[in-house]
Amino acid sequence: MPLSPYLSFAGNCSDAIAYYQRTLGAELLYKISFGEMPKSAQDSAENCPSGMQFPDTAIAHANVRIAGSDIMMSDAMPSGKASYSGFTLVLDSQQVEEGKRWFDNLAANGKIEMAWQETFWAHGFGKVTDKFGVPWMINVVKQQPTQ
């Protein structure tokens, strides 16, 4: 079974989906808003397990595919700023041009942690935190020697 990360956004999941579609070519596989959920499945003020209320337009669950890998996401906080730590999403490419394009797209309005460059292990590598605060490594691995 594959391992899929789940990103929690602070009321801007729809914006993040559109951003990843534009910058990384993400394919939207599934999306449901809180307003589209059956009323029986929605939190009510008196029995809300999360203790939070979401607008109907907030995303309850979404799944996108980026470079063959699924990333799930939702609006887990009604507003504020999401904080991401302790992990980094890694995008591997076989083509330097593709990796550089991904890096440049994520770096626009983001923060470069390590500039795009060739390393001893990669034809191209860079670390960036995107405009939503999600950390990424973009990697174009060199051919591994056979043993």
UniProtKB/Swiss-Prot annotation:
CDD domains cross-referenced by the UniProt entry: PhnB_like
Effect of a null allele: No effect on phosphonate metabolism in B strains.
Domain of life of the native organism: Bacteria
Listed transmembrane segments: none
Disulfide bond positions: none
NCBIfam families linked to this entry: PRK10148.1 (NF007537)
UniProt protein name: Protein YjdN
Upper lineage: Bacteria, Pseudomonadati, Pseudomonadota, Gammaproteobacteria, Enterobacterales
Gene name of the record: yjdN
